[in-house]
């Protein structure tokens, strides 16, 4: 009595099909499959090493010469 037999599962399946309908179950299955595929693609993309190493950005000296350092005064 601890486990369900095949007949129990078939009756449950029949009730689910009658309640939701085959079209709704088909849509749920395709949505679930798309979600699993998206998850696998996300995991695969996150585990790959970057192909191109990041390049160091050099400071533009002409822009630094024109920069003015100011302090904001607090309005009283």
From Swiss-Prot:
Example of a GO biological process term: protein transport by the Tat complex
CC per GO annotation: TAT protein transport complex
Entry's localization field: Cell inner membrane
Residue ranges crossing the lipid bilayer per the database entry: 1-21
Stretches with biased composition (Polar residues): 55-65
Entry keyword set: Cell inner membrane, Cell membrane, Membrane, Protein transport, Translocation, Transmembrane, Transmembrane helix, Transport
Region (Disordered): 44-76
A GO molecular-function annotation: protein transmembrane transporter activity
Chief location category: membrane
UniProt-listed InterPro entries: TatA/B/E (IPR003369), TatA/E (IPR006312)
UniProt keyword Cell membrane present: yes
Pfam family membership, one: TatA_B_E
Membrane disposition: Single-pass membrane protein
Keyword flag Transmembrane helix: yes
Family to which the UniProt record says this protein belongs: Belongs to the TatA/E family.
The protein's role, per its UniProt record: Part of the twin-arginine translocation (Tat) system that transports large folded proteins containing a characteristic twin-arginine motif in their signal peptide across membranes. TatA could form the protein-conducting channel of the Tat system.
HAMAP family in the cross-refs: TatA_E (MF_00236)
Subunit structure: The Tat system comprises two distinct complexes: a TatABC complex, containing multiple copies of TatA, TatB and TatC subunits, and a separate TatA complex, containing only TatA subunits. Substrates initially bind to the TatABC complex, which probably triggers association of the separate TatA complex to form the active translocon.
Name assigned to this protein: Sec-independent protein translocase protein TatA
Organism of this sequence: Methylibium petroleiphilum (strain ATCC BAA-1232 / LMG 22953 / PM1)
